[in-house]
Amino acid sequence: KFLKKQKKNKTIVLLPEKKYTRFIENKLQNLQLKNYKIFKYSADPKILTGEIEILTNYDQRKKNLELRKKVFKDKDDKESQKELEKLEKKYTLGDVNFDSVIIIDFGSSLKSVLTSLAFTDVSENKVLFTTLNQWFDESIFYENTVKSLYYPSVNYKEFKRYKDNYFKTFNNFPSEI
């Protein structure tokens, strides 16, 4: 429903190749989502960025930008020079073939995926980023790779109050489960 309200209809579900991958794929089929594709990536961060580059057609979008710059480089009129200045500020030219991403990952691996998406110039102005319950990892709030990250969650203030009260009562923090 959320994606529909946001008018997103070409979703990529990103999930790492791990022991539970097949289980997640089965659960996704049971949800009967529409217009989505699954993209499985290596949990190895050294391989991840290359895989995200392929997913986002990064090399082609980079070539598109260079070709477009060449068109305006030889022209002397002000409009062409203005356009060239705009192009010089970009890393790629062209859109990716999806408008929303659901990332089924956590912790540092999630941060690696977000960083790779930012590196490959996937615009959060055009693509909606969603992940799973991330409220237990406060460090994600301070990540600067993506400013608009959506995730289903409990009310964070209530959760923090619960943790504080639990600690005061039992002199221990509650389990994250």
Language-model-detected regions and their locations in the chain:
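Short, well-ordered alpha-helical microsegments
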Residues: 21-22, 109-111, 136-139
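Extracellular/periplasmic periplasmic-binding protein-like sensory domains
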Residues: 34, 50-72, 76-80, 96-100, ...
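Extracellular/periplasmic Venus flytrap/periplasmic-binding protein
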Residues: 1-106
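Hydrophilic extracytoplasmic domains
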Residues: 90, 110-115
